[in-house]
């Protein structure tokens, strides 16, 4: 007889983008319930131990967290399996470091180092807009936030710029043709480009056609697209490569060129 949720996660069943080696043990950290889906997040233990290399063991990670050194979106987090996700800001005041979680073009999480000024805000995609008791309007964001009394012009799929200190909407970006977006799901995850056109299919998924800065075009579902700036200028700094996916041949040529230069 089943008794509630599974408390364990086998390593082979963990998401591929966590990049855990097969022979590193039998189990992987099971993410706690939180603002991001378990298959679309990166637990804090993996950020500190596997990515930043600030700890060698699980126990060392717990020690760092219990000293309240790690902040996610401006709040101290002590849960070792807290699910940090796309666009979250991970701050370590002790070392004066800030990182934003973004995707690389292979669909894996990249801890992108950012300045203090950029760590004060994050971009949140609007999931839905509803009315509560007494007709009070509120919006829900992709990371589980509820914000009351938003601007009436904000609609679902738009992106809001959220001040993390005051938890207030500073600005917003309309989900429109001509704006720069990042793909957050599917085979094109991590790619950045400008929306060229929207294809509406009644009773099915809306298709978005995107063109990257090299002129390559690709298409994806509406749910996979996340607006990150107005026009062609993103509001957040992007990791190395700027979201341009290279072909296998282009990657090989780039590798050869770097080897010859070295």
Swiss-Prot record:
PROSITE patterns: RIBOSOMAL_S4E, S4. One of its GO terms (biological process) is translation. The keyword Repressor does not apply. InterPro entries: KOW, Rib_uL2_dom2, Ribosomal_eS4, Ribosomal_eS4_C, Ribosomal_eS4_central_region, Ribosomal_eS4_central_sf, Ribosomal_eS4_KOW, Ribosomal_eS4_N. It comes from Arabidopsis thaliana (Mouse-ear cress). One of its GO terms (cellular component) is plant-type vacuole. SMART domains: KOW (SM00739). It is found in: Cytoplasm. It comes from the Eukaryota. Its main location: cytoplasm. It holds the Pfam family KOW. Keywords: Cytoplasm, Ribonucleoprotein, Ribosomal protein, RNA-binding, rRNA-binding. One of its GO terms (molecular function) is structural constituent of ribosome. The gene is RPS4B. The lineage of its organism: Eukaryota, Viridiplantae, Streptophyta, Embryophyta, Tracheophyta. Belongs to the eukaryotic ribosomal protein eS4 family. This is Small ribosomal subunit protein eS4y.
């Amino acid at each position: 007889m089943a008794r509630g949720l599974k408390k364990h996660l086998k390593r082979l069943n963990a998401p591929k983008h966590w990049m855990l080696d097969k022979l590193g043990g039998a189990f992987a950290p099971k993410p706690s319930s939180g603002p991001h889906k378990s298959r679309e997040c990166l637990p804090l233990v993996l950020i500190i131990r596997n990515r930043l290399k600030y700890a060698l063991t699980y126990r060392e990670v717990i020690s760092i967290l219990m000293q309240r050194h790690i902040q996610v979106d401006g709040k101290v987090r002590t849960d070792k399996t807290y699910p940090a996700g796309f666009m979250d800001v991970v701050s370590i005041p002790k070392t004066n470091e800030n990182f934003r979680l973004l995707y690389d073009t292979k669909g894996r999480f990249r801890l992108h180092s950012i300045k203090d000024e950029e760590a004060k805000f994050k971009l949140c995609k609007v999931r839905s807009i509803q009315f509560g008791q007494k007709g009070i309007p509120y919006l829900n964001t992709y990371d589980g936030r509820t914000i009351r009394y938003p601007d009436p012009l904000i609609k679902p799929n738009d992106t809001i710029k959220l001040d993390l200190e005051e938890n207030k909407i500073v600005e917003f970006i309309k989900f429109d043709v001509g704006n720069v977006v990042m793909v957050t799901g599917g085979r094109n995850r991590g790619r950045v480009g400008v929306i060229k056109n929207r294809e509406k299919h009644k009773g099915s998924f809306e298709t978005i056609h995107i063109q990257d800065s090299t002129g390559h075009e690709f298409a994806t579902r509406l749910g996979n697209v996340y607006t990150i700036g107005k026009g062609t200028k993103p509001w957040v700094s992007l990791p190395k490569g700027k979201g341009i996916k290279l072909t296998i041949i282009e990657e090989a040529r780039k590798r050869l060129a770097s080897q010859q230069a070295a």
